[in-house]
Amino acid sequence: MRALLFDPYCGASGDMILGALIDLGADLEYVRSAVESVGCRLEVNERRFDHIRAIRVKVISDKSFRSLGGAIDILKASALTSRALERALRILDIMASAESKVHGVDRENARFHEMGSLDALADIAGSCAAMESLDVKRILSIAPSVGGGITDTSHGMLPVPAPATLEILRSHRIPWRGGPVAHELLTPTGAAILAASVDTFLDHHPEIVTERVGYGAGSREIGMPNLLRAILGEIPHHMQHDRVVQIETNVDDVTGEILGSLIDMLMKEGALDVTVVPAVMKKGRSGSVISIISRENDARKLSAVLMRETGSLGVRVFPALHRLIAERRIESVEVMGRSVPVKIGSIGGEIISVKPEHDVCRRIAEELNIPVKDIIRIASEKGWRIAGRKID
């Protein structure tokens, strides 16, 4: 599978991402037209950092904007295709949501701390055009470095990571690390592009057969090569993998009603899966083994919920389990005038599973007063037809 891997060992900004993608071989004519269509001019230059060649892009514009609505209008009028535009609007939405949350204002009045001019918007449009032109099936990233210290923004002096950047990392559950220097390395624009584009964040480099390597140069002097590395290549196996934590505890004094509500609560708090298995405890007592699959950064929170709700005095945590998972995507099918999400699973282009969202099927069945199994059957049949047309 053709994949793009970002390696933000020195963070990421919009211009660094754009430069790295151009260096990888993105269609420069399409990228330039995307940037120019939002009212900017693109300069592409080659630079060297300690004998490492990199692409430094500079976006030139004397126009400015502040409102979300204005930015949306500019993007919609741009030269981006519908696919690239969808990603660009998603990036903008992520940034607006973060600024709104941090500053306590509504989204339309959110003030983008990087966007005194159109530079960041041009970086977004150019990066989306570049990623589309590279035509990859999967985008991965190593956990980004954010830097440290204090940074000067249009909101004043702020700690690193900047509040908007940190909110993006939090809301999208992106793992990150501090350092390696006391500068702002990961900007809100860079974080938002990664959040909207990356399918999986990793702690270390995956198994990949490298085709090309690109370097995007940052504008600041930070005492080390200020570069973002991007790798284009083939992932030799088609199952994805990630790192999860397994949390367990045994209980013998918890009712079925409490266990049912506990499962719902854990899933709402971010658990990936929860199972309850009947067991025979010491002294022949009947009980249950509660097992939770969790992301690493959610383990402490979910352990606290488990202990608080069951009264358990301790839990077992099995860290850093490697989970192999099939590729998954969500498509929508129409059933009797209603939209039903269908999860399609595949390995190496071979479809292995098509499952309609049960809760949606049940709701439609109740509205139309027909058996839920009929809704599931119709949605499944349509899902398989869609899946067959879209095999890579």
Curated annotation (Swiss-Prot):
Keyword Magnesium recorded: no
User: Which InterPro entries does the record cross-reference, listed alphabetically?
Assistant: Ni_insertion
For this UniProt entry, the molecular function terms from Gene Ontology, in alphabetical order, are: lyase activity; nickel cation binding
Give the UniProt keywords, A-Z: Nickel
Q: Which family does it belong to?
A: Belongs to the LarC family.
Name of the featured protein: Putative nickel insertion protein
Q: Which organism is it from?
A: Methanothrix thermoacetophila (strain DSM 6194 / JCM 14653 / NBRC 101360 / PT)
